[in-house]
């Protein structure tokens, strides 16, 4: 595979408009989903409540399970079958009940167990797992998750500004922000429940995306130091991406294979993490090639390093002329 992508000369940067259109369309679909169906589907860890994973001896009727809970005063509980037809999860998120549980009153889990024993008989239901989170803890976890992503972005910007240049840092952070937004859109569109493991996946992708962008930008910096007479910044970006392409292909293929194994073989609890990681790895690869480079090109054109304004305008004119020349060459080739 390394030899296949050796000494390639693909023109990546010129496809930035197509890449921007695709990503904006996907992010817009996510915003529409937010507007139509409401906010993110948070897990018990963020909303507060009780989650119980149950196993019945014989497959029950979901309507009977719900009627048993309603009779016990547990209104609005979410009942979901997963895996075998005897395995169910019950999520109780009623605010008054959660507050009562947080205050030390009888736990909702006990009420659920008693209600099901009364309906189906004692010993017919086995409790596999129980999670209970108070409303205050859930709010603190939501705030902490948001702060973690914000702090990660800030430190990435600071590191790149010191290591490279603030223009590189800004391009990398904007590219990483793109990855976060498009991953959130994916989570919303496909109704993935946001738990602590999903937040961990998003934070992992922040570092993964930034790392891949840094590798390409490091090669750009090296190529800028070399004699590059007649080469525009877009040419240097294309050359740098092509030079790091074998490494990118091997790294991303390995990482995606690991997440794919999790997706296919892991259980229901870890599967949302695997979905987000698999999608995020693909998007991190895409953004490091088609988003970070064009963003750097735009930033360098908007705030050039050159002190002479006339020279800076000449550089931007040269970029435009190069784009026009490429288009003319393609027409001539036809």
From Swiss-Prot:
Tell me the membrane topology, using the record's own terms.
Multi-pass membrane protein
Q: Which UniProt keywords apply?
A: Cell inner membrane, Cell membrane, Membrane, Protein transport, Translocation, Transmembrane, Transmembrane helix, Transport
Q: Does the keyword Cell membrane apply?
A: yes
| Keyword Cell inner membrane among UniProt keywords | yes
Q: Where in the cell is it found?
A: Cell inner membrane
SUPFAM superfamilies listed in its UniProt record: Multidrug efflux transporter AcrB transmembrane domain
Positions of transmembrane segments: 18-38, 144-164, 168-190, 195-217, 258-278, 279-299
Provide the assembly information: Forms a complex with SecD. Part of the essential Sec protein translocation apparatus which comprises SecA, SecYEG and auxiliary proteins SecDF. Other proteins may also be involved.
Concerning its family, UniProt says:
Belongs to the SecD/SecF family. SecF subfamily.
The family database entries (PANTHER family) matched by this protein are listed as: PROTEIN TRANSLOCASE SUBUNIT SECF, PROTEIN-EXPORT MEMBRANE PROTEIN SEC
Q: What is this protein called?
A: Protein translocase subunit SecF
What is the species listed in this Swiss-Prot or TrEMBL entry?
Gemmatimonas aurantiaca (strain DSM 14586 / JCM 11422 / NBRC 100505 / T-27)
Organism classification, top ranks?
A: Bacteria, Pseudomonadati, Gemmatimonadota, Gemmatimonadia, Gemmatimonadales
